[in-house]
């Protein structure tokens, strides 16, 4: 597989990631931040099912720090998703490099406390988490599996933007 083909495969993966992230953010994640009357009952039921099935305490009773991440997702990330999807599906858009690096670093940074909380929080003693919560290590790993793609794909994006020779190269404009 040639370098161009490999680059296009990664760009398509990233494009699919950003397209899929739009409805997940709008219809699931932001329910923990926005007023409930904005959402039809079907979406509320979907969130309730997810929260109970995966025992996600962050989505059942979101702590303030988690809501701050959701606010950033609404204000900064959601507007970026269609732009990034366009750039990666179109391909060869060098202008996406810096915004993609900023997005990747921001997302990776927010996932670290989320994953740390899921793995190490003593939910039995934590007063901030009142709903269902993971009770054993297997349930914690299942929940980590839900969040892990939002760490892994941005990490791939970051490395791709930093290491791929096509995106590292800056074209110098000719002076007239």
Swiss-Prot record:
Record-marked site positions (Important for 20(S)-OHC binding and stereoselectivity): 150
Localization per Swiss-Prot or TrEMBL: Rough endoplasmic reticulum membrane; Nucleus membrane
Membrane topology type: Multi-pass membrane protein
Primary localisation category: endoplasmic reticulum
Stretches in topological domain Lumenal: 31-68, 121-140
Residue span, EXPERA domain: 10-158
Binding site for cholesterol: 75, 77
Keywords: Endoplasmic reticulum, Membrane, Nucleus, Transmembrane, Transmembrane helix
Transmembrane annotation, as ranges: 10-30, 69-89, 100-120, 141-161
Sequence motif ER retention motif, residues: 172-176
Site, Likely important for receptor folding: residue positions: 56
GO cellular component, one term: rough endoplasmic reticulum membrane
Intervals, Cytoplasmic compartment: 1-9, 90-99, 162-176
Any single biological process term in GO: regulation of intracellular cholesterol transport
Family listed: Belongs to the TMEM97/sigma-2 receptor family.
PANTHER family linked: SIGMA INTRACELLULAR RECEPTOR 2
Function: Sigma-2 receptor which contributes to ameliorate dysfunctional cellular processes and slow degenerative progression by regulating cell functions including cholesterol biosynthesis/trafficking, membrane trafficking, autophagy, lipid membrane-bound protein trafficking, and receptor stabilization at the cell surface. Forms a ternary complex with PGRMC1 receptor and low density lipoprotein receptor/LDLR at the plasma membrane, which increases LDLR-mediated LDL cholesterol internalization.
Domain notes: The EXPERA domain doesn't possess any sterol isomerase catalytic activity.
Subunit and partners: Homodimer. Interacts with NPC1; the interaction impairs NPC1-mediated cholesterol transport. Interacts with PGRMC1 and LDLR; the interaction increases LDL internalization. Interacts with histatin 1/HTN1; the interaction induces HTN1-stimulating wound healing. Interacts with TSPO.
Protein name: Sigma intracellular receptor 2
């Amino acid at each position: 597989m040639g370098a161009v083909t490999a680059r296009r495969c990664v760009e398509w993966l990233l494009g699919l990631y950003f397209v899929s992230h739009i409805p997940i953010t709008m219809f699931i994640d932001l329910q923990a931040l926005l007023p409930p009357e904005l959402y039809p009952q079907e979406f509320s039921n979907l969130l309730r099912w997810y929260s109970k099935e995966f025992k996600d305490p962050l989505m059942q009773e979101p702590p303030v720090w988690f809501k701050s991440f959701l606010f950033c997702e609404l204000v900064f990330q959601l507007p970026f998703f269609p732009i990034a999807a366009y750039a990666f599906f179109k391909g060869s858009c060098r202008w996406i490099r810096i915004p993609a690096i900023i997005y990747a670093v921001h997302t990776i940074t927010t996932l670290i406390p989320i994953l740390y909380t899921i793995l190490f929080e003593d939910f039995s003693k934590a007063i901030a988490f009142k709903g269902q919560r993971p009770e054993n290590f297997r349930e914690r790993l299942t929940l980590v599996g839900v969040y892990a793609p939002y760490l892994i794909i941005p990490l791939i994006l970051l490395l791709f933007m930093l290491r791929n020779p096509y995106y590292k190269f800056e074209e110098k404009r000719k002076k007239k």
